[in-house]
């Protein structure tokens, strides 16, 4: 099927993918723009997974001060090369992540960063609450697992729903940018400040 050049251009603007990738996705989707976006997203996730093992030693420190000066965020975002660290898309991602941190107050980057004692304590509290409600031990355990998953979504940046599109997580947002930029990207650390806290 011949693909309209305007459609290719529209898809490219929507996704940031290359012209040939957009053309190929549109051909695969028989001209369906929404399906082509989905195809590119799936390919992007596959690309991001391949790049995830590569070392990130370059990057930037991004500072964000929220309007009114009451909330501030310092973020270290790493990439593979200094060329990418100066890229506008990379800077845009740093700002989006800083906005997320300012709004949603995560405490850790990934679930692996949460100290074991904290996880054990949260699980214990959830189990005890379920038992106090009269739930059997095996049910209390399942409830505790569910509450721990919810806890991770609240305190881990990568697991939080993105504030501008709650259908994707911050980890998925980072993977989209990895696919667009073509390099591994990692949030190394962050610090959120709030006046009076």
Curated annotation (Swiss-Prot):
Compartments reported by the entry: Cytoplasm
Keywords, alphabetical: Cytoplasm, Elongation factor, Protein biosynthesis
Protein family (similarity comment): Belongs to the EF-Ts family.
Gene: tsf
Transmembrane region(s): none
Cytoplasm as UniProt keyword: yes
Organism: Sulfurihydrogenibium sp. (strain YO3AOP1)
Main localization, broad class: cytoplasm
Keyword Cell inner membrane appears in the UniProt entry: no
Entry GO terms, CC: cytoplasm
Function: Associates with the EF-Tu.GDP complex and induces the exchange of GDP to GTP. It remains bound to the aminoacyl-tRNA.EF-Tu.GTP complex up to the GTP hydrolysis stage on the ribosome.
Record-level Gene Ontology MF annotations: translation elongation factor activity
CDD domains: UBA_EF-Ts
Protein name, entry field: Elongation factor Ts
Positions of the UniProt region annotated as Involved in Mg(2+) ion dislocation from EF-Tu: 81-84
